[in-house]
Amino acid sequence: AETYDVIVTPKDEAYTIFAQSMDRTGFARGTLAARAGMMAAVPALDKPEPLTMGDMMGDMSGAMGAMDHSMHAGMAAAGASTRVRHARTEYGPSVDMRVDTPRTNLDDPGIGLRNNGRRVLTYADLHTVGGPMDKRGAGREIELHLTGNMERYTWSIDGLEFGKSTPVHFRHNERLRVILHNDTMMTHPMHMHGLWSELETPDGRFQVRKHTLNVQPAQRISFLVTADALGRWAWHCHLMYHMDAGMFREVVVA
């Protein structure tokens, strides 16, 4: 669901643009060329990689060694200093794990892309030219947790699937900070319709402006939003089967 603007100065030859699925069962390709009919070589698919607990939990430096997946609590992350609070609604059948000390770094390539011999673009590499659109600081904060139960295959926010949830309310033209905390072992690209999300570094500096923000397993991110568009907006995981299973909220700007 993410989009990127890329500026290139091509030579008089063809270039393959190649995207492969996470499970390496297929790919999509396009050709950038100076004229119709030019073709370039298509790379081979990478070999499938089995996902380990470390892959799914984002290289938490051994903190998962004593984890019992039937318990799902108290999982420590290297480098994290602040424990978090979980909503009461997270303690129910829709949530099978909670991350108490998430990681906050933005330079992890993600599942299946670590140490593969190629340079991989991360959020730490991205910088929006010109800085934030709104120079105001945040007037308030909202923290939400991305939650799920992998055995039941339900996905939710703060332990509530969409049908059980109430809208998130933004005041018109306010500037606020949103904190997303991933309590699952899956990556969730969160897309907020109608409004821009301005990602911050762990120490609160502006990094990049996005409409969809990828939240990795056991990760905590924060971003600033200016609620300048009146109306009712969808906010959901852009893995559509996660959205359909409940990881969806309505945002009301009024």
Label the predicted regions.
Residues D23-T25, M185, W196-E198:
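Short, surface-exposed beta-strand-loop junctions and turns on beta-sheet-rich folds
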Residues I157, T166-V168, P189-M192, W196-L213, ...:
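Intrinsic, low-complexity N-terminal interaction/targeting segments
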Residues A1, E161, R205-F206, A218:
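Short solvent-exposed loop/turn micro-motifs enriched in small/polar/acidic residues
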Residues E2-V6, H211, Q219-F223:
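Short strand-edge motifs at loop-to-beta-strand transitions and within beta-strands
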Residues L180-T184:
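Asparagine-centered strand-capping/turn motif at beta-strand->loop junctions
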Residues A1, L144, V178, H193, ...:
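Divalent metal-coordination and catalytic microenvironments
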Residues E2-R175, D228-R232, M240-A254:
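Extended terminal and domain-junction accessory segments
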Residues F18, H188-L195, H236-H242:
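Histidine-centered divalent metal-coordination motifs
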